[in-house]
Amino acid sequence: MRRVSVLLLLVLPVAGLAAAAGLFAPLPGGTFKSALQYEDAKGGVRIAPFALMRKPVTNAEFLTFVKAHPQWQRDRVARVFAEPRYLSHWQGATELGPKAEPGQPVTWVSWFAANAYCESIGTRLPTWSEWEYAAAADETRKDARKDPAWRERILTWYSRPSNQALPRAGLQAPNAWGVQDMHGLVWEWTDDYSSLLVSGDNRNQGDADKTKFCGAGALSMDDRENYAVLMRVAMLSSLEGSDATANLGFRCARSAR
């Protein structure tokens, strides 16, 4: 899949690097005890320093992208890269309309389109481990996962009716890393979303496509009370790269320079 997306972007004009440091929050990385335990990483997942977008990508930002890269407009995109519902809430191929406010996180967007957006600004989608690492923080603690009240707050969002209008991105208080909206706004694509529940022994073999689709390694749930993680894994691993839903968006990451 990565080779396909790279080839696509080679023929696109590059939108430029995401130079504004304020859009990204730096995270130091380290050994992270994931709620998902891989057989080959029982002591924790090693996460290199990286930076994560403070907020999810908005409709306005994605509109700028599709105007610059018209092959990602909903009436031109190849169906192998986006299903028919892709950006279906927009008024038109290059018009947002009343159902897609500029400041709301973009949804109805496929993995392929999200990945292309990130690559067009010199970034990438975060891995599951990076996303989980950033999402473990609350407003004051870098790891709040053992707090039952914090977990209950997240589960309350998951039980919210999905037909409610989305708030604007960036309304939540930043967490301890300076990242907003990790919970309570939209689900988010990760680079390796489809490998989360797949068994295999290819995880460290170096083929990006095999890792993405075939090689997660055997998984177990280390913290069985963290139902929110189970829900995220179940949701993401049920999707194809061309799928789009009303409550699934994304944000970009970049490796430390």
Question: Which residues does each predicted region cover?
Answer:
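Mature N-terminal segment immediately following signal peptide/propeptide cleavage
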Residues: 24-31
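Cytochrome P450 core scaffold surrounding the K-helix E-X-X-R motif
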Residues: 36-37, 193-201
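Disulfide-stabilized, aromatic/cysteine-rich ligand-recognition loop
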Residues: 20-23, 48, 104-105, 109-111, ...
